[in-house]
C-alpha cells in the first residue's frame, strides 16, 4: 500500500535509509535534534509522467490524488523523517548532479553549528523514464555507443541509472561514546557557482577549481593531503575536459587516483 503511494525515487530513499540506520544502530538522541537533509535532482518524475498519460487517456477524474505528494522533490526526505520520527530540520536540496553532495555538506554544517546531534543525509534519483531519456538524448548527453567512459578520449556521453545512497552523520564525540561503527569523517565542504551555463561548465573548469580550493580551506588541508579524488566524470566532452583542467589546477602534476562512479 505504501509503495503504491510513493514514487520509485522515494522507495529507493527509504530502502537506503533503512540500511544506513540499521548499520548505525539506534540513535539515542532527542528526535528534535535529528535532521533529514536530502538531495535529488528531479524527484518524482516517473509518477508525473504516468499520471499525465492517465489524464490524457482516461480523464481528469482518474488522476491519482497522491500525484502531488508523490512528485514533490522533498517527498523522499520527508518520508524518511516521518518513518523514523526525526523532528529536526527536514530539507531537500535540488541542485542537479550536485544535490546529494550539497545535502551532505549542509548536514555536516548543522552538526558543526550545534543545531543537530545527528542527520540522515544523502540522495535518491529515479529519472530513467521515457521522456527524460528522450530529453537527455536530444541534448546529446547520452552515449550513442551505450558505454560510459569518463575522461576517455572517445567518450560521448553517459548512461542513465537510478538508485539512492544515505549516510548517518553524528558528532564525532557522541558517535565514539556510543560505540558507533564509524566509516568516515567529514572534515570540510564547500559549494559555489560558476555562473556560466545551465548544462555546461565554465571554460577551464574555473568554478570547480575554486570549489575544491574552498573545500580544502574549510578542512584545513593542503592539496598534498588528498589521496583520492571522486570526480563527477559524466563522460561528456565538455564536463570531463573542464573537470580534468580543474583537478590539474588544484593538484598539479601529482599522481592522485581519480575515480568516477
Task: Name these PLM-found stretches.
Residues 1-15, 33, 43-106, 115, ...:
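Conserved catalytic cysteine-centered active-site region
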Residues 147-221, 227-228:
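Condensing-enzyme catalytic core mediating Claisen C-C bond formation in acyl metabolism
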Residues 17, 36, 80, 100, ...:
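Conserved small-residue
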Residues 31-38, 91-95, 116-124, 181-189, ...:
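Beta-strand segments within the central parallel beta-sheet cores of soluble alpha/beta enzyme folds
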Residues 115-138, 143-156, 189-203, 231-240, ...:
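Acyl-CoA/ACP chain-elongation machinery
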Residues 1-34, 211, 215-223:
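Conserved active-site "lid/cap" helical segment
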Residues 25, 114, 170-174:
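Short loop segments at secondary-structure junctions
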Residues 142, 167-171, 217, 239, ...:
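Short beta-strand-to-turn element immediately C-terminal to the catalytic PLP-Schiff-base lysine
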Amino acid at each position: 500500500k505504501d509503495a503504491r503511494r510513493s514514487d520509485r525515487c522515494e522507495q529507493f530513499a527509504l530502502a537506503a535509509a533503512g540500511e544506513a540506520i540499521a548499520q548505525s544502530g539506534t540513535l539515542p538522541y532527542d528526535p528534535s535534534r535529528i535532521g533529514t537533509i536530502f538531495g535529488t535532482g528531479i524527484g518524482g518524475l516517473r509518477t508525473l509522467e504516468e499520471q499525465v498519460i492517465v489524464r490524457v487517456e482516461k480523464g481528469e477524474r482518474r488522476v491519482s490524488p497522491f500525484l502531488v505528494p508523490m512528485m514533490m522533490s522533498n517527498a523522499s526526505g520527508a518520508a524518511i523523517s516521518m518513518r523514523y520520527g526525526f523532528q529536526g530540520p527536514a530539507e531537500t536540496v535540488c541542485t542537479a548532479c550536485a544535490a546529494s553532495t550539497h545535502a551532505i555538506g549542509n548536514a555536516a554544517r548543522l552538526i558543526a553549528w550545534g543545531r543537530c546531534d545527528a542527520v540522515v543525509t544523502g540522495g535518491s534519483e529515479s529519472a530513467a523514464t521515457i521522456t527524460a531519456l528522450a530529453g537527455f538524448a536530444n541534448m546529446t548527453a547520452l552515449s550513442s555507443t551505450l558505454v560510459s567512459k569518463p575522461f576517455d578520449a572517445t567518450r560521448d556521453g553517459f548512461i542513465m541509472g537510478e538508485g539512492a545512497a544515505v549516510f548517518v552523520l553524528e558528532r564525532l564525540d557522541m558517535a565514539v561514546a556510543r560505540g558507533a561503527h564509524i566509516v568516515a569523517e567529514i572534515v570540510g565542504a564547500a559549494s559555489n557557482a560558476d555562473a556560466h551555463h545551465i548544462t555546461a561548465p565554465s571554460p577551464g573548469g574555473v568554478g570547480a577549481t575554486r570549489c575544491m580550493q574552498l573545500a580544502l580551506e574549510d578542512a584545513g588541508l593542503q592539496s598534498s593531503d588528498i589521496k583520492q579524488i571522486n570526480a563527477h566524470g559524466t563522460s561528456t566532452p565538455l564536463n570531463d575536459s573542464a573537470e580534468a583542467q580543474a583537478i590539474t589546477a588544484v593538484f598539479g602534476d601529482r599522481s592522485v587516483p581519480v575515480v568516477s562512479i
